[in-house]
Amino acid sequence: MTIKTEEFLLNLGPQHPSTHGVFRIVLTLDGETVVKAVPVPGYLHRGIEKLLESRTYTQVIPYTDRLDYLAGMLMNWGYVHAVEKLMEVEIPERAEYIRVIVGELSRIASHLVATGAYAADIGGLTGFIYTFRDREEIMDLFEMISGARLTPSFMRIGGVAYDIPDGFMERCKKFVDYLPEAIKEYNTLITGNEIFQARTKNVAILSAEKAIDMSLSGPVLRATGVNYDLRKVRPYSVYERFEFEVPLGTKGDCFDRYYIRLLEMEQSARIIQQAMDQIPEGPIRAKIPKMIKPPVGEAYAEIESSKGIMGTYVVSDGSTKPYRVHFRRPSFVNLGYLNEMLRGWKIADVIAILGSIDIVLGEVDA
């Protein structure tokens, strides 16, 4: 008697807590082993790029908040950076420093969600509670400076919307001084946990060559040992004035991808501290017309967001509205290698591998 075996098709999502949003993976399984994984994004597609063609250049800014809604400040920055390049606008120094402070706070907030949610994915809910407790302080700081917590719409073409309010610097300094202690707690709760290490170490190892071939960026790339951070290799704004290190992994496995984010939070705190010490007095916005009409042309600019390289391509026809806006979304690009990363691993590992990439569906689907 012969036993017939066949591959099994399983839909993971779109409504599944570990997909961090409405995201579906069609898994082909041989027993419990993944043979093939097809990501099916698009459930949160809102047609943002098309909508922007009928908005003025300033009206575009709130839409960028809704890309990576866990790092709204950085999404704002990526867009205004491209328009400023097109218009050849010189940004006041004070505005540049404010951008760095809120941008790095946004990076820390995003990484706090990534590390806490990753622990919860693997079964350790306690770490999630601790990281969200500390992220709340950043949300309060954003509310102080912009009036909003999650969708700040804080950046403006030529600078920022508001100057630093009273009490902000003191509260921000208190937070960055406290952060190293918080990270020690995360290391105790999450990093040093034997079960967490067993689920993440040597799982879904990614080589530097493959990461470069697939145009991966951010912590996913640097976990493979590739020393590529735009703030260092192609400094924008005033980043060349700050001393900080670029944390790198050695194996490129799930653990490295997780741990890189913890180390990056420490470096972001260093940058914020230096920016607060060095910030000059002066205007917070360049003198540009109220009605923004960039010259006919195109520009592409990139920033280092929390997920990787966020690029914005803007085409101007000389009117008050962009002819075309396109975003290079790092989560979307990083997700392109998911099939290769999942192949050969057990279904239980799928959650650990997907969580290590740290995707945000607002940015993936746009």
Swiss-Prot record:
Say where the protein is mainly found.
membrane
The record's listing under SUPFAM superfamilies reads: HydB/Nqo4-like
| InterPro entries linked to this entry | NADH_Q_OxRdtase_suD, NADH_UbQ_OxRdtase_49kDa_CS, NDH1_su_D/H, NiFe-Hase_large
Q: Which GO CC terms are listed, alphabetically?
A: plasma membrane
- Reaction(s) catalysed by this chain's protein: a quinone + NADH + 5 H(+)(in) = a quinol + NAD(+) + 4 H(+)(out)
Enzyme class, broadest EC rank: translocase
The topology of this chain with respect to the membrane is: Peripheral membrane protein
- Keywords, in A-Z order: Cell membrane, Membrane, NAD, Quinone, Translocase, Transport
**Molecular-function GO term, any one:** quinone binding
**What does it do?**
NDH-1 shuttles electrons from NADH, via FMN and iron-sulfur (Fe-S) centers, to quinones in the respiratory chain. The immediate electron acceptor for the enzyme in this species is believed to be a menaquinone. Couples the redox reaction to proton translocation (for every two electrons transferred, four hydrogen ions are translocated across the cytoplasmic membrane), and thus conserves the redox energy in a proton gradient.
Q: Subunit notes for this chain?
A: NDH-1 is composed of 14 different subunits. Subunits NuoB, C, D, E, F, and G constitute the peripheral sector of the complex.
Kindly provide the name given to this protein in its UniProt entry.
NADH-quinone oxidoreductase subunit D
Chain's gene name: nuoD
